Amino acid sequence: MASSSLCHRYFNKITVTPFFNTKKLHHYSPRRISLRVNRRSFSISATMSSSTKKVLIPVAHGTEPFEAVVMIDVLRRGGADVTVASVENQVGVDACHGIKMVADTLLSDITDSVFDLIMLPGGLPGGETLKNCKPLEKMVKKQDTDGRLNAAICCAPALAFGTWGLLEGKKATCYPVFMEKLAACATAVESRVEIDGKIVTSRGPGTTMEFSVTLVEQLLGKEKAVEVSGPLVMRPNPGDEYTITELNQVSWSFEGTPQILVPIADGSEEMEAVAIIDVLKRAKANVVVAALGNSLEVVASRKVKLVADVLLDEAEKNSYDLIVLPGGLGGAEAFASSEKLVNMLKKQAESNKPYGAICASPALVFEPHGLLKGKKATAFPAMCSKLTDQSHIEHRVLVDGNLITSRGPGTSLEFALAIVEKFYGREKGLQLSKATLV
């Protein structure tokens, strides 16, 4: 078995060796992107099929939303035809941490369909529900028998794949607390991503992007994986302690529980939105997800359907300790054109209360409305030219007094952890970083 990064390898049938210089990635990202992936006994055809690859991602009540959304988003960025299927009796799913999603279809309606890849997210009780879903078990076993790809993350390798007998004689990884269970049915390893034959496994929320890009590579080839990974602004050293850059330090105060508003709109970046909501809810903040427009259901940038708690019209009636915007081009443009939201943000800034944004939103929302005046900020690399002050754009997470900004999907967990740190302290941020495997 050989360890290597996505950015520095090529494959033959058994071994893995470097395939190109990482400097070529600078077209996509100013930082080298690294995936810590272990692989054994697999092959990739020298010529990838040009036909669209079909991917199934089953979800259930209690599915880990960040894992599911990243998998969907990244595989769709790669050009795969991704079907999100609910194993419940309805397409609406109440994922972990109170995050609501809407699947594309019911699994019961597509059990005869054939997929190039089936990917299982984790989360509890969602992982148990997937394990107990007989139609899904049958599909995954047939997938294995037919020599097609199966993948699972978090608790799913141990709960589902292990229980179904797919891991006998295989190396696999999973969420740390399930390692003992995994060891009873596989050779358990602590890799962030593990490939053994046609089985790919990974550990948890913080490894999901690496896991997903690895599967883009398995399914669509290394060139497509590099193309997809660059704009994600992935961590250069995944697993290392997260860091933030802070200027003009001030305390972020709150009474009782932090009240946090997360607006979303059609075209919002789903990975960023869910990362912010997921991590802040883990920290026990009171997070209000508010939809712009007339519907609680929002279709995000990669067609993930998210359901807000309230409409912005309702959310406007309350005050917040923080207003924080996800990115996504369509979502940021909607935010910028919402007089109601812009007025809320201006009032927040004038009151010296925290506000923040990631990806396109600092450049498309904050900059044109004067919300970055006298402040240092960062944004999505391709949007940084729109910032008047570009002196600190290289930072992944930047805090300037009551303002916090960040770069893109691959910085979204760090961004959310930085918010936790500002409200609750460094120890709480590190605790959640460890729990999410950032």
From Swiss-Prot:
Transit peptide segment: 1-45
Subcellular location: Plastid, Chloroplast
Domain PfpI endopeptidase: 53-220, 258-424
GO molecular function, one term: glyoxalase III activity
Alphabetical UniProt keywords: Chloroplast, Plastid, Repeat, Stress response, Transit peptide
A cellular component term, taken from the record's GO annotations: chloroplast stroma
Record note on quaternary structure: Homodimer.
Known function: May be involved in oxidative stress response.
NCBIfam families: not_thiJ
Family, similarity comment: Belongs to the peptidase C56 family.
Protein name per the record: Protein DJ-1 homolog B
Gene name in the database record: DJ1B
